[in-house]
Amino acid sequence: MAVPKRRVSKTRAAKRRTHYKVSLPIPVKDKDGSWKLPHRINTKTGEY
């Protein structure tokens, strides 16, 4: 079983965690000019 050789400092652990981020969906402009999320139905026109 693998065991850490030495303790990881708070700073080093925080630097590693900077890459753990949530990617937000990018809104797309629809044909009628309103913004919507991709792969969602437009509530005004009913189009996908």
From Swiss-Prot:
Gene Ontology MF term list: structural constituent of ribosome
GO biological process: translation
Annotated GO CC locations: large ribosomal subunit
Region (Disordered): 1-48
Classification via InterPro entries: Ribosomal_bL32, Ribosomal_bL32_bact, Ribosomal_zn-bd
UniProtKB keywords: Ribonucleoprotein, Ribosomal protein
Biased composition (Basic residues): 1-20
PANTHER family: 50S RIBOSOMAL PROTEIN L32, LARGE RIBOSOMAL SUBUNIT PROTEIN BL32
NCBIfam families given in the database record: rpmF_bact (TIGR01031)
Family from the record: Belongs to the bacterial ribosomal protein bL32 family.
Full protein name: Large ribosomal subunit protein bL32
The species this protein was found in: Campylobacter hominis (strain ATCC BAA-381 / DSM 21671 / CCUG 45161 / LMG 19568 / NCTC 13146 / CH001A)
Lineage: Bacteria, Pseudomonadati, Campylobacterota, Epsilonproteobacteria, Campylobacterales
Gene expressing this chain: rpmF
